[in-house]
Design a protein with these regions (language model features):
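S-adenosylmethionine-dependent methyltransferases
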Residues: 1-157
Length: 157
């Protein structure tokens, strides 16, 4: 697993070809004044790096369709768009995470579409449009396991 590389600007991490800002970065601090994520979307979680590592060893098709569920600040979405040229739809239940995701997509020079939706409400027909559906650290409550299993079942039909 590659080490995180600190770049000259404070509170910026570089790993797997993407830049992610820490909770203490000046842009993030500014965003936090107006946007307060409520569903664990207050930072980039370590599990995003684990997923990036996995996807580095199990490459996605170039320019494929990717949906990230529970995207938070969008680290995995940014990685897929940057490394594989994927067209990404980032989905989260908390609308307050999208300004943070937009900053990350901007500093990494990628475009990411996003939508505020409960992943248990996404229809199988829509899920079937994506070659890859990813998510990391999305079962932080026991009550999320069954809806996630149901999502996988709908996606595979």
């Amino acid at each position: 697993m590659p080490k995180l590389v600190r770049v000259p600007e404070r509170n910026v991490e570089h790993a797997y070809g993407v830049y992610l800002l820490s909770y203490e970065h000046r842009l993030i601090k500014r965003l936090r004044r107006d946007h307060q994520p409520t569903i664990h979307g207050q930072k980039s979680w370590e599990s995003a790096y684990l997923m990036m590592d996995y996807l580095s060893h199990h490459p996605l098709p170039k320019k494929g369709q990717v949906m990230e569920i529970g995207c938070g600040w969008g680290g995995i979405s940014v990685f897929c768009a940057r490394k594989y040229g994927s067209k990404v739809l980032a989905v989260d239940l908390d609308p307050a995470v999208f300004p943070f995701m937009n900053v990350h997509s901007h500093i990494n020079a990628v475009e990411i579409e996003h939508r505020c939706v409960d992943f248990s409400k996404i229809k199988g027909r829509e899920l079937g449009q994506y070659q890859t559906i990813v998510g990391s650290d999305i079962c932080f409550w026991d009550s999320l396991v069954k809806p996630l299993v149901n999502l996988a079942t709908r996606a595979l039909k």
